[in-house]
Amino acid sequence: MRTKWFVFFAIAVTLIVFGRLVETPSLSKSAVVLGIGIDYDESEETFEVSTQAVLVGSSSGDTSQTSFVCTSAKGGTIAGALDVIARKMGLIISLSHCNVVFVSTAALKLDHMQLVYPLTGMYAWSEQTIFVTGNKSPSEMLSLRIGTTISSPFFLQQALVNEEGSDGMIRTTAKDFLARSLSRSKSNVIPYIVA
């Protein structure tokens, strides 16, 4: 009986100590990504990944300054390109608030697990992220100013969520995209944005 309590106490102490030692980065050290663009160059076999991130910085007094930054990088994998972006920015990338993923038609021809799994497994990507494609490259789509907002991913997310079903508008989340890709038919429908 005493050994059971000792083991329980040792586990509790270990969890408390290591829970205090793990550093949680502040918002000023993180790049909160709102939208990500994935393009694939078939000739070089590289991914070009673009992100639109919100950078929160402090300014004079108690006010904080927010800016939107678009950054692109190439890599052999999506995770490799995101690592290059993190080094360029000097910040930790967080995809937990990513609203929209712009995927080029060349990237859609690849294995869909190769597109989705690195983001969900390594970067805590939300399953409710919306997939879209369009007539422009993903980096151009991210840098566009659409509607009345500064952030095109935020505007598109609001439009697709609020207007779903009207005028034939559809919304395909990352969860739906992967489920349909792994189904027997292996067919997907995602919104095509013309800007």
Regions found by a protein language model. Give the residues of each.
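Membrane-proximal alpha-helical signals and transmembrane carboxylates
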Residues: 1-195
